[in-house]
Amino acid sequence: MTSRKYFGTDGIRGRVGQFPITPEFMLKLGWAAGMAFRKMGACRILVGKDTRISGYMFESALEAGLSAAGADVLLLGPMPTPAIAYLTRTFHAEAGIVISASHNPHYDNGIKFFSGQGTKLPDEIEMMIEELLDAPMTVAESENLGKVSRINDAAGRYIEFCKSSVPTSTDFAGLKVVIDCAHGATYKVAPNVFRELGAQVVVLSAQPDGLNINKDCGSTHMEALQAAVLAEHADMGIGFDGDGDRVLMVDHTGTIVDGDELLYIIARDLHERGRLQGGVVGTLMSNLGLELALAEQGIPFVRANVGDRYVIAELLERNWQIGGENSGHIVCFQHATTGDAIIASLQVILALRRSGVSLAEARLKLRKCPQILINVRFAGSGVDPVSHPSVKEACARVTEQMAGRGRVLLRKSGTEPLVRVMVEGEDETQVRAYAEELAKLVTEVCA
């Protein structure tokens, strides 16, 4: 397949004001997308965004480009990414567009697409859009321009969808939960979902100002949530990222429960009830302890490349239902077509209530192996540190020294200029030493 010029592992992302995250490019992208989706005839496209300030600028640019191509546009306003996937399906739209940089700071932004089925856009459509981006822009005849309208009840529709993922008899009365919305796209919907199910809800970071999204809050900065759970004597805390497709949790002792542990809790509950279809999909970054714990339950486990689109592709290929990443992307295909943080957290709470144990007790059933991850800034000097001979030789040596009781993984981030150095094994001191050794070598090679 031809290599992509603009699309990365999860759409298009970068620094606001730097190509391609500019109004000019977004105008052209909207036009190219509209032209691609209109090849089958008239179409309408949903557009949603998170709460970062640049979203308004890019929403207007995309709207103009789509309309110029003759595509009708439905504006959703600030909504979680999985909500846009869901609403794209329910409105029978040809595609959905999300303006978001997920867990990144406010000065980044990006675009990702959903197909009309609420799934990640097929590669061939992405390539068609890329080709059109390099073609001259034309404008439809006046009578064929796309119409633009705003959907005012999007939040209510999505809240009801989330609630429909649990049995109608579900009552969270007696549950006290702290929710950190990261000043992001879940700030309106998440608290209402849990309140309407009967929980006592304490809300953090739900006052977006366009600049504070993900700033010292949410699933990438859990300290405030940990402190609030302890101060409020809550049963648990739930931390979302800026666009609502990642979730981490905090138990009543203030301990973080990561995506591997949440995935295990959901999968074990389904397995014990005879509801697990197939096995579980993790990633190259999933903790070895998850694989071992699932094996003890007789649950198959496979690893996909890092990125929720690869987890989803593996689930589709195997006709399995459950997968995710330790970062908190969790896919529950029996309920949603993509990673949905609110739905995943609801499934965890249901599993806990069925088993009668606390989140703290449930997480201890998964014995994680020490895993050290070091991010090394990579400026793109022309040298690929991951495939550099000295780095490959060092990785092979460390792997041999661990004698089958650990893993080494080096990979470039698909969304940031980073090389991720991960070492995993039984002895934390040894694992840390190996990781620091490899990170130092990668730094030297990058320099």
From Swiss-Prot:
SUPFAM superfamilies: Phosphoglucomutase, C-terminal domain (SSF55957), Phosphoglucomutase, first 3 domains (SSF53738). Keywords: Isomerase, Magnesium, Metal-binding, Phosphoprotein. Activated by phosphorylation. One of its GO terms (biological process) is UDP-N-acetylglucosamine biosynthetic process. The keyword Zinc-finger does not apply. Signal peptide: none annotated. One of its GO terms (molecular function) is magnesium ion binding. The active site is at 102 (phosphoserine intermediate). InterPro entries: A-D-PHexomutase_a/b/a-I, A-D-PHexomutase_a/b/a-I/II/III, A-D-PHexomutase_a/b/a-II, A-D-PHexomutase_a/b/a-III, A-D-PHexomutase_C, A-D-PHexomutase_C_sf, A-D-PHexomutase_CS, Alpha-D-phosphohexomutase_SF. NCBIfam families: glmM, PRK10887.1. Catalyzes the conversion of glucosamine-6-phosphate to glucosamine-1-phosphate. This is Phosphoglucosamine mutase. It comes from Pseudomonas syringae pv. syringae (strain B728a).
